[in-house]
Design a protein with these regions (language model features):
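Histidine-centered catalytic micro-motifs
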Residues: 47-59
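Short hydrophobic "helix-edge" motifs at membrane interfaces and signal-peptide entry regions
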Residues: 42-48, 99
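Active-site gating loops and adjacent loop-to-helix segments of metal-dependent hydrolytic enzymes
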Residues: 60-96, 123-127
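N-terminal metal-binding scaffold of metallo-dependent hydrolase/deaminase domains
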Residues: 1-35, 44-45
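Divalent metal-coordination and catalytic microenvironments
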Residues: 5, 24, 53, 109, ...
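Residues that scaffold the ATP/ADP-binding catalytic core of kinase and kinase-like folds
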Residues: 29, 59-60
Length: 134
């Protein structure tokens, strides 16, 4: 059970909220409740956030474009590097990168993600045999 001094519920902020969790699911929410022995106590409780715009593959580019040379680097040079990088990624590598990024988001408290990627074809431009590959 979780006891929150304040919790943001669908109807707005509530005080003294006790949440019952059974089998990993919220089964009861009680307002103006009293904490019970063994409750996890928090001062404020919010719903988990959603990341509405993720490019998980860019996590694997971290460090490749951290410094720019004045007058030589721009959004367009970054974009060219990104597409060259994508040309080398396999579906298995994309899956591993996304698994890491999604795990990091979950650990940070995100509950959902809207994922966008630029990989729709194999390196060289041919379509994947399995259209569900990417």
């Amino acid at each position: 059970m979780i006891f929150a001094e304040r919790a943001l519920l669908p109807g707005g902020w509530a005080e003294q909220v006790r949440i019952t969790v059974t089998g990993g699911h919220i089964t009861e929410v009680s307002k103006a409740a009293a904490p019970q022995p063994g409750d996890t106590r928090v001062s404020a409780l919010l719903p988990a956030l959603s990341n509405l715009h993720s490019h998980a593959f860019q996590r694997a580019m971290a460090g490749m474009t951290e410094h720019r040379i004045a007058g030589r680097d721009s959004f367009w040079t970054w974009r060219d590097l990104m597409y060259r990088f994508l040309d080398r990624l396999t579906p298995a590598q994309m899956e591993a990168i996304a698994a890491l990024v999604f795990m990091e988001m979950q650990e940070a408290g995100y509950a959902a993600v809207g994922e966008f990627h630029y990989v729709h074809h194999q390196p060289g431009g041919d379509a994947y045999a399995d259209i569900a590959e990417l």
